[in-house]
Structures are given as structure tokens and as C-alpha cells.
Amino acid sequence: MEAPAELLAALPALATALALLLAWLLVRRGAAASPEPARAPPEPAPPAEATGAPAPSRPCAPEPAASPAGPEEPGEPAGLGELGEPAGPGEPEGPGDPAAAPAEAEEQAVEARQEEEQDLDGEKGPSSEGPEEEDGEGFSFKYSPGKLRGNQYKKMMTKEELEEEQRVQKEQLAAIFKLMKDNKETFGEMSDGDVQEQLRLYDM
């Protein structure tokens, strides 16, 4: 009999928690829907934000919106201290999301512009890198042994890097052959043709 009584006593608290959760989700959903139309005006603003002048005004604008939400929240869980604590962290998140959403949208727009610029640079890069490759100067890429495919490494590497790549490939090939010999029951017998095929794959 005590268990049903405890459940009945906890039922209002559970209902309040559920109501708070639903309200928080609706606020987040509304905040996610509202920045989409507002994303067009902030796009011209990022160059102005680079100066730093408008940046403080934007985070301050949603804060007054937090004060109307503040009195509503404490009124609901006033009698429940435990539920008030989760509502407290949830409360700043609701108003914080509208402030964070435009900022995140602006950051994403800036990142997208940077990626587009890099793509444009990448498209222009190969045409300008052609003469540099012939001279052997100015062309650079991040070298990581064993990661290049086909004959890429022959065209792009210095002599030292080419030797390192071939050394790594030989180590990989030796590991493959050892694995195949150690696991004959899994892979079967290795013929000379198999060895030649592997050597051809590694261009050796």
C-alpha cells in the first residue's frame, strides 16, 4: 500500500516535470524556427561584427526576453525545489538558444564563406601550381607515408619523401605476406602469381 501512495504523491511532481520539459522543447523549437527568417539580415552584419562594435548589442538583445520567461518559470515550480533546479539550468538555455542560434548561424555563414574561398583558391591553385611543380619550388602538401594511392607519390614528392613512401610500402607488403603465410588455412597457399600481383599493386 505504501508504494501506490508514494506514486500518487510523486504524480504531481512528474506531471510538472513533464510540463516543464514540453515547454522547454516548444521554446527551443520556436527559437530554432525564428532565426531562419532572421538569417538573411545577419549575413551582411558579419563584416561589421569583425570590427567588434555590434557584437555586444546582439547578445544583450535576447536578455530582456529572458525576464518575461523568468517570472513564468519560478511560478510553476515554486513548491518543488528539486524540479526548480533542473528548470534553472533549462531556463537560461531557452533564452540562450535564441541568442546562440543567430550567433551560430553567423559563424556557419562565415565558415561557409571561408570554405568557398578555399574552394576557389583550390580551383585556381592547380593552374598556378603547374609551373611551380616544374621548377620544383613552392609546391607543398602534407605528406603522410602510406596514404597516397597509385603513382601520386612519384609526381609530388621529393627524393627523401619518395624513399620514405617506398620503405613504408615495403613494410606493409612484408606484413601482408607474413599474415598470409601465418594464416594459410584462412587465405590458402600463396603462389608466385599472388606475390607478383601484390608487387604490381605496390608498383615494385
Curated annotation (Swiss-Prot):
> Where are its TM segments located?
7-27
Q: Which InterPro entries match?
A: Mxra7
Topology in the lipid bilayer is annotated as: Single-pass membrane protein
Residues with the modification Phosphoserine, per the entry, are: 191
UniProt keyword terms in alphabetical order: Membrane, Phosphoprotein, Transmembrane, Transmembrane helix
Leader peptide range in chain numbering? none
Basic and acidic residues biased stretches: 110-126
Any one GO CC term of this protein is:
membrane
Location of the region described as Disordered in the Swiss-Prot/TrEMBL record: 32-148
Biased region (Pro residues) positions are 38-47
Q: Which spans does this entry mark as compositional bias, Low complexity?
A: 63-103
Q: Where in the cell is it found?
A: Membrane
Q: Which domain of life is it from?
A: Eukaryota
Presence of keyword Transmembrane helix: yes
- Its main subcellular localisation, reduced to a broad class, is membrane
Query: PANTHER family per the record?
Result: MATRIX-REMODELING-ASSOCIATED PROTEIN 7, TRANSMEMBRANE ANCHOR PROTEIN 1
Name-wise, this protein is: Matrix-remodeling-associated protein 7
